[in-house]
Amino acid sequence: IAQKRIPPIVLIQIANGGGDAQGHQRGREYDNMSGLFAEYIETEVLPRVEKAYKLKLTKDPEGRAVMGSSSGGSASLIMAWFRTDLYRRVLTTSGTFVNQAWPFDPKYPDGAWGFHKTIIPNSPKKPIRLFISVGDRDLLNPNVMRDDMHDCFIALH
């Protein structure tokens, strides 16, 4: 920033809703397969930040990024996927791309788990730049999930 290679950055961090998985506020906010959370951020959170800190945030989706870890990582991709008019840069660290969506949506029966299996492969290309960071010790977990838990990386190439 000091060398003017990138513009100033405003980082806004939001705590997730309570509980975990289906039936809880967190599943409603972070894991629903729609643009609702992005719309909430756009219409409720960002205007309050602009007013409280006397800022003018860009509306240009090329100048915005969304990021998160765990459920926040999947929420970040969901926000950009369904609202490319708002976000086109995504950073997800150890994103939990699982099915915790609530309420159930028959259009996306696998929730975020469907990104690598059906959603990305069966969709037109989107103007999203995606950075994914994950650990490399998943297979040491004695509770390994389904066999195709790593196919997300194949689907995203």
Task: Write out the residue ranges for each language-model feature.
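Non-catalytic cap/lid and distal C-terminal segments of serine-dependent acyl enzymes
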Residues: I1-H157
